[in-house]
């Protein structure tokens, strides 16, 4: 659909003119109405087996549901969309089970059951059934969203007219295809000697199997991570009022990708456990593994975590690398950690609460010595709170100690 809409024979200037949002919405809705998804097959089955009122109401539920999802996108209701993102994995599973149950019910019950206009309760159930299926099925909602938001040169100047055109296109074309198939089956009945029962049985079986195949394929292919085209940074306000970018398209690939990455990283940092998620209670063994991998190079300089050289051992003298010492002392080794952002935010938040208080990792030289980092009996890092002046004084004392070591070796 995306390639088809981009290859339309009329220029973008016509599509982008102030007099064409309704026409353009009608064209897009017509293309969406021809898509084959679970909702369209269920509506077609209801039209043939349960009668015209049931089929029309089912198509109406699909059209309203797809238009409502586009309404949330185009008018910037990002808060609702974020909640939909959060519920999408569970929602997809529930909708998939509901669709499978509905389709299996169609296969088991192939009798003709006409629903009349007086049966308002049954019609309402049919309407809600298709509306929920389409809204919760990524194959339907994402197909509509990716088609509309991938069009170049259209600025959605009048969203209401555009959405009305989309709704009419989806509903009219969907019903038109259903009535066309119904007319062809009627013509086939007249021309052949088959009984009406055999027609109902075969039509129900074919449509139900096709719907089940589409459901399985969409469940395998679509998942919540495919929604990378949605710009989560858009403010909750109608797009018609946004003039900062001089009516550019709804989003660009770079903008949407960056927005999604920020959202994804936020969710991952919130939900996934990290070995260095807290500054206190960090096992020495984990820190030692990280320290050996990220700080010590192929030509290791034996330093403890405070940036001081180790003492001589029986294997020989160890020459300290003072650039590495300086980097460790300035806490630059945090930048090599995969949890650098989390630790940095944690430290900044602590400083912002009380600028006169900082968190500092205090440990013994033996605990942080590389020779003992793999020892399971090593103690854990503890956190002590000190004032900012004491912390600065401690740094000055450390500089002086390093300078004294350099002077003694020289």
UniProtKB/Swiss-Prot annotation:
This is Protein TIC 214. It comes from Mesostigma viride. GO terms for biological process: protein transport. Involved in protein precursor import into chloroplasts. May be part of an intermediate translocation complex acting as a protein-conducting channel at the inner envelope. Keywords: Chloroplast, Membrane, Plastid, Plastid inner membrane, Protein transport, Transmembrane, Transmembrane helix, Transport. The chain crosses the membrane at residues 22-42, 61-81, 87-107, 131-151, 161-181, 210-230. It is a multi-pass membrane protein. GO terms for cellular component: chloroplast inner membrane. Part of the Tic complex. Belongs to the TIC214 family. It is found in: Plastid, Chloroplast inner membrane. Its main location: plastid.
């Amino acid at each position: 659909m995306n390639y088809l809409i981009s290859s339309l024979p009329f220029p973008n200037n016509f599509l982008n003119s102030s007099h064409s949002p309704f026409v353009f919405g009608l064209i897009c809705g017509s293309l969406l109405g021809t898509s084959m998804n679970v909702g369209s097959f269920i509506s077609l089955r209801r039209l043939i087996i349960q009668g015209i009122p049931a089929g029309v109401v089912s198509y109406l539920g699909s059209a309203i549901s797809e238009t409502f999802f586009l309404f949330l996108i185009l008018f910037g209701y990002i808060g609702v969309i974020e909640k939909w993102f959060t519920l999408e994995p569970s929602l997809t599973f529930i909708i998939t089970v509901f669709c499978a149950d509905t389709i299996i019910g169609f296969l088991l019950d192939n009798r003709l059951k006409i629903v009349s206009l007086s049966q308002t309760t049954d019609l309402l159930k049919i309407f809600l059934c298709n509306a929920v299926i389409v809204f919760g099925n990524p194959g339907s909602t994402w197909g509509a969203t990716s088609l509309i938001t991938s069009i170049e040169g259209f600025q959605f100047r009048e969203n209401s007219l555009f959405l009305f055109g989309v709704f009419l296109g989806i509903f009219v074309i969907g019903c038109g295809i259903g009535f066309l198939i119904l007319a062809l089956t009627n013509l086939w009945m007249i021309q052949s000697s088959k009984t009406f029962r055999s027609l109902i049985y075969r039509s129900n079986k074919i449509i139900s199997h096709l719907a089940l195949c589409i459901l399985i394929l969409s469940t395998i292919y679509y998942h919540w991570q495919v929604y990378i085209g949605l710009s989560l940074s858009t403010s909750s306000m109608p797009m018609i009022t946004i003039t900062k970018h001089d009516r550019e398209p709804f989003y660009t690939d770079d903008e949407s990708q960056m927005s999604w990455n920020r959202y994804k990283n936020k969710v991952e940092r919130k939900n996934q456990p990290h070995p260095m998620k807290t500054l206190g209670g960090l096992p020495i063994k984990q820190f030692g593994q990280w320290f050996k991998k990220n700080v010590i190079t192929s030509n290791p300089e034996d330093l403890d975590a405070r940036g001081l050289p180790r003492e001589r051992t029986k294997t020989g003298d160890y020459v300290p690398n003072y650039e590495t010492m300086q980097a460790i002392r300035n806490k630059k080794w945090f930048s090599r950690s995969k949890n650098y952002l989390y630790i940095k935010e944690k430290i900044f938040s602590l400083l912002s609460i009380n600028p006169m208080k900082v968190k500092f990792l205090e440990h013994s030289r033996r605990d942080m010595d590389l020779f003992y980092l793999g020892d399971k009996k090593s103690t854990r890092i503890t956190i002590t709170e000190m004032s900012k002046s004491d912390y600065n004084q401690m740094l000055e004392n450390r500089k002086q100690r390093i300078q004294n070591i350099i002077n003694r070796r020289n």
